[in-house]
């Protein structure tokens, strides 16, 4: 049987997210859903596209709950095919061992994952995470501050996500219904 990928999207305070799921699990989450984005995702995955709403029902439901402020752990299966062994080790540790509302430093994640690499290498793994939000790279921070973020519109998205999870205090203009204003 030929492997396939199905696409679905979720409206969130951060915009319309695209989710790609194979028979194995969620393989990719991107920060926008557009025809070009889907084509690039399909090319990257190298799989034919099918229409399979049932495959996407649980991942989309869990993403909507997440953006509703529900402090749950994602329980959807993950398809790690777009990661190398180091990424899989580090991102797998992050997925299973850094829950809602907690943060960990880049160096701390390197230690916890027993990856044997420095904080800078962990930062590179976070920047290449094909499944942001579900594999919560926004929870990884610098030892001297919030650190960087390559998802969405950048650092303001990371700050918004950490505030939603209670890891950062809310500012007077913070809103669960409205994401950060793009810079």
What are these regions (language model features)?
Residues 117-160:
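Short glycine/serine-rich loop segments
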Residues 1-116, 165-183:
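Basic nucleic-acid-binding alpha-helical/helix-turn surface characteristic of O6-alkylguanine DNA
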């Amino acid at each position: 049987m030929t492997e396939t990928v199905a696409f679905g999207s979720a409206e969130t305070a951060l915009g319309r997210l695209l989710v790609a799921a194979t028979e194995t699990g969620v393989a990719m989450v991107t920060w926008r859903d557009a025809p070009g984005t889907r084509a690039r995702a399909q090319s990257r995955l190298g799989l034919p596209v099918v229409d399979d709403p049932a495959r996407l029902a649980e991942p989309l439901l869990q993403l909507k709950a997440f953006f509703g402020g529900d402090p749950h752990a994602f329980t959807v299966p993950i398809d790690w095919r777009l990661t190398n062994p180091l990424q899989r080790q580090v991102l797998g540790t992050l997925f299973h061992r850094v829950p809602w509302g907690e943060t960990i430093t880049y160096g701390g994640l390197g230690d916890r994952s027993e990856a044997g690499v420095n904080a800078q290498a962990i930062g590179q793994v976070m920047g290449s995470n094909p499944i942001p939000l579900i594999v919560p790279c926004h929870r990884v921070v610098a030892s001297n501050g919030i650190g960087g973020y390559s998802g969405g519109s950048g650092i303001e998205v990371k700050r918004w996500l950490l505030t939603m999870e209670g890891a950062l205090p809310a500012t007077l203009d913070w809103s669960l219904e409205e994401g950060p204003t793009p810079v």
